[in-house]
Design a protein with these regions (language model features):
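Conserved alpha/beta-hydrolase catalytic His-Asp/Glu region
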Residues: 165-167, 183-242
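Flexible "cap/lid" loop of the alpha/beta hydrolase fold
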Residues: 141-146, 151-181
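Conserved HGGG/HGGXW glycine-rich cap/lid loop of the alpha/beta-hydrolase fold
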Residues: 48-97
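Conserved catalytic-core motifs of eukaryotic protein kinase domains, centered on the activation segment
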Residues: 73-75, 98-104, 165-168
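Short beta-strand/loop motif that positions the catalytic acidic residue
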Residues: 240, 246-252
Length: 255
């Protein structure tokens, strides 16, 4: 592909995001989405632009979302954090609204490399705090292992993938699994599982947030590629001499 072709793909991805943003029902989601900046990375990522929500002033704090989610996962804590920190919320590579033509494969190593490039582009080199939710918790530990001198605190929210070994899902099961996760009834069920009191807390706004990124071109293929890699597992071995706190819900059905 030529540079012009990648540029066109990037523009189409941004156009989809802008359309999705205007359809958001949750005012907190819209508030967060309005702070998205499109960060252009180097040729390693085909010079594409990636969505990163950035707001506030102070010491930097990066928030890492979970599997098959997006930056919108943090809409309910963004405004509060923004009062005291420079908040940075990227979509992980191959997830959310990130362009799916940045690479031919999606795996934990590529995600970490991408995050390091995001931080370098934003010139963040020290005093970085990390909040990682679900799979984002494992991502946080691996990131801190790669750049320990840049990190000073980590908060893990119901972290997933800390133990065990990666389980590669071969073709065509990875594609079948990704297609299954795209079914509306499956999305609704998973969304409800993420809340302790789904009957009271889950409505149209929450269900929309959980699925709005599925319209990104290449969503299924990037998800299948990540599944084929085995994903994050056994990341407790990456724990460094960095202050870490873990917070889990009493009735966390996903964990």
């Amino acid at each position: 592909m030529t540079n012009k072709h990648f540029e066109k793909i990037s523009d189409l991805n941004i156009k989809f995001f802008e359309s999705a943003k205007m359809s958001l029902l949750d005012p907190l989601g819209l508030y967060l989405a309005n702070d998205v900046k499109w960060i252009e990375l180097n040729g390693k990522w085909n010079s594409l632009k990636f969505p990163v929500a950035i707001g506030g002033k102070g010491q930097p704090i990066i928030l890492l979302h979970g599997f098959d989610s997006s930056f919108l996962e943090f809409r309910r804590i963004y405004q509060s954090l923004k009062r005291n920190f420079q908040v940075i919320i990227p979509d992980l590579l191959g997830f959310g609204f990130s362009p799916r033509s940045a690479t031919n494969e999606y795996n934990p190593s590529k995600i970490i490399s991408y995050l390091i490039d995001i931080l370098e582009t934003l010139r963040i080199t020290n005093n970085l705090k990390i909040i990682g939710a679900s799979m984002g918790g494992s991502t946080a530990l691996k990131l801190s292992f790669e750049i320990p001198n840049a990190i000073n605190k980590i908060l893990l929210l119901s972290p997933a993938g800390l133990f065990g070994e990666p389980k590669n899902i071969p073709f065509p099961l990875n594609q079948v699994g990704a297609s299954f996760l795209g079914l509306p009834q499956v999305r609704r069920s998973l969304c409800r599982q993420a809340f302790a009191y789904p009957d009271k807390c889950v409505g149209e706004m929450e269900e929309q947030i959980a699925s709005i990124h599925l319209g990104c071109k290449g969503w299924r293929d990037s998800l299948a590629s990540f599944a084929k890699s085995g994903g994050f597992a056994g990341t407790q071995k990456y724990i460094q001499n960095i202050p870490i706190k873990t917070l889990c819900g009493e009735n966390d059905r996903i964990l």
